[in-house]
Amino acid sequence: MKLFAVSDIHGATKPIERATPLIRASDLVVIAGDITHTKTRAEAAEVIACIEQFSGRILAVHGNWDKIEVKDLLEEKGYSLHGKGRMMGEIGFFGLGGSSPTPIKTATTYTEEEIALVLQA
């Protein structure tokens, strides 16, 4: 299986467009968070739509820079791996979005206890 893995997009669609040949050649796009810069659902939808032009097979988690509404968008589209596992062929993908607390204020952080609850679910 050929993967196109990306993280820390922060709303920038130009690099995605430049990677079109790689995305089209992949079997699956994996987004490992920080989809937005402005943290909004609208910006996340724009980034996801850009990727969807080139691939319909996407798995993703929201990042600590993304608001919960971005997680909700990924879930609505069936792309979210937050607290879930999904098999793609013989390969398992498992995810946890956001982050543990950081020195800087970010949109989505989880305490160690919250992380443990998600991972145990």
What are these language model-derived features?
Residues 1-4:
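Extreme N-terminal starter segment of soluble prokaryotic enzymes
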Residues 6, 11-88:
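Core catalytic region of metal-dependent phosphoesterases/phosphodiesterases
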Residues 66-121:
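Conserved catalytic scaffold of divalent metal-dependent phosphoesterases
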